[in-house]
Amino acid sequence: MARKTVSRKRKAAAASAAGPGGLYGEQYGWDHSVHKRKRLPPVKRSLVYYLKEREFHLGTLNKVFASQWLNHRQVVCGTKCNTLFVVDVQTGQITKIPILKDREPGMVNQQGCGIHAIELNPSRTLLATGGDNPNSLAIYRLPTLDPVCVGDDGHKDWIFSIAWISDTMAVSGSRDGSMGLWEVTEDVLSKSDSRHNLSQVPVYAHITHRALKDIPKENTNPDNCKVRALAFNNKNKELGAVSLDGYFHLWKAEHTLSKLLSTKLPYCRENVCLAYGQEWSVYAVGSQAHVSFLDPRQPSHNVKSVCSKERGSGIRSVSFYEHIITVGTGHGSLLFYDIRAQRFLDERPPRACYGQKQKLGGSEILKLTTGKGWLNHDETWRNYFSEINFFPNAVYTHCYDSSGTKLFVAGGPLPSGLHGNYAGLWS
């Protein structure tokens, strides 16, 4: 029988179209009415099976909470010890960035919080993160990372999350239960440029919020209405917010913030991360042991959830890249969920892959595990944890580069009293 051949050009074209999820045949749309879709047999192995880890040494920094790629070789990170730094993934070099202070920096006395969020605007010309005061919003210009301004008169508690809703407007979500809308005007930007030209010392403006809205508190304990995570739907100009009382809130977010709805989440413990999949029109919400997929246009009983099988450690980070949802856990695991096939990647990996396999509902799923990192054997460790030989590093943050072939992963030990760090490049 004649052998069927495929030209190398066609093979190359097909391979170039695959992201980290690889090729899975024809793409199916998400069925919003019943949340069911045909399970697709993979026809090509996902790229994530071939990822290998290279750890970075971060010295004595404590727990990396946030990260974003700046370009093909630099990642900016924020830590629990309130350090903002850039790591060069080719050389491993660490460069610390000065953090921005309030008008009255002497009033800041909040240890143990740090930088929980870093976000780039759509044009990648501005970066928003926390300031020296964890209640304040700091804006830097890219690619230089020159300071632009600080929003220091809004929140009364730590900023947990940030989302850009346009090139000049960002929203911050705080532990005080409020969401602040901030605008970086042309006037602020031009004055920032002129100040840098006149001064060799970093100078920056102080801005006030354009709007400050509290999330609804009528159905729950007001003390637990902390805004933990934000994600923006640019197509509909809608902002999703998750609060620690187990609710999802949706806001219209353009020139101001207008509440659209609030709904109780099916799994409402430790809802600390949120991502939006534009192609799928769903929000992914992480909880103690589940990832829930929420379409605000559908009834709440249509919410689909999948279990990570790592109970107790929590889902600490979640992201969309094409049809693959990457899940970082408190046990130091990276799991990969195929939203088209509606299952975790579970085919037997090739011999050359770097990863472990874990049982899930009778089948095997791919689980990549973070490396050893660094742990401070301080007094807390000696008094309470010295008999435990190994602590997994919680995946507090992860992000793909623009090509989808490099995955930066960072975090640290899960117990709040332990001091340590982990950062690695999987490629």
From Swiss-Prot:
- Cellular component per GO? centrosome; Cul4-RING E3 ubiquitin ligase complex; cytoplasm; nucleus
Keyword Chaperone on this protein?
A: no
- What Gene3D superfamilies does this protein's entry cite? YVTN repeat-like/Quinoprotein amine dehydrogenase (2.130.10.10)
Pathway named in the protein's UniProt entry? Protein modification; protein ubiquitination
One GO BP on record is: regulation of autophagy
Instruction: Note the SUPFAM superfamilies from the entry.
Output: WD40 repeat-like
- Top-rank taxon of the source lineage equals Eukaryota
Presence of the UniProt keyword Ribosomal protein in the record: no
Cell compartments where the protein resides: Cytoplasm; Cytoplasm, Cytoskeleton, Microtubule organizing center, Centrosome; Nucleus
What Pfam families does the database record attribute to this sequence?
A: Beta-prop_DCAF12 (PF23760)
Q: Where are the WD repeats?
A: 110-150, 154-192, 222-261, 310-347
Instruction: Give the intrachain disulfide bonds.
Output: none
In UniProt terms, what function does this protein have?
Substrate-recognition component of a DCX (DDB1-CUL4-X-box) E3 ubiquitin-protein ligase complex of the DesCEND (destruction via C-end degrons) pathway, which recognizes a C-degron located at the extreme C terminus of target proteins, leading to their ubiquitination and degradation. The C-degron recognized by the DesCEND pathway is usually a motif of less than ten residues and can be present in full-length proteins, truncated proteins or proteolytically cleaved forms.
PANTHER family per the record? Answer: DDB1- AND CUL4-ASSOCIATED FACTOR 12, DDB1- AND CUL4-ASSOCIATED FACTOR 12-RELATED
Q: What quaternary structure, including any partners, is listed in this protein's UniProt entry?
A: Component of the DCX(DCAF12) E3 ubiquitin ligase complex, at least composed of CUL4 (CUL4A or CUL4B), DDB1, DCAF12 and RBX1.
Q: Which family does it belong to?
A: Belongs to the WD repeat DCAF12 family.
Q: What is this protein called?
A: DDB1- and CUL4-associated factor 12
The organism's taxonomy opens as: Eukaryota, Metazoa, Chordata, Craniata, Vertebrata
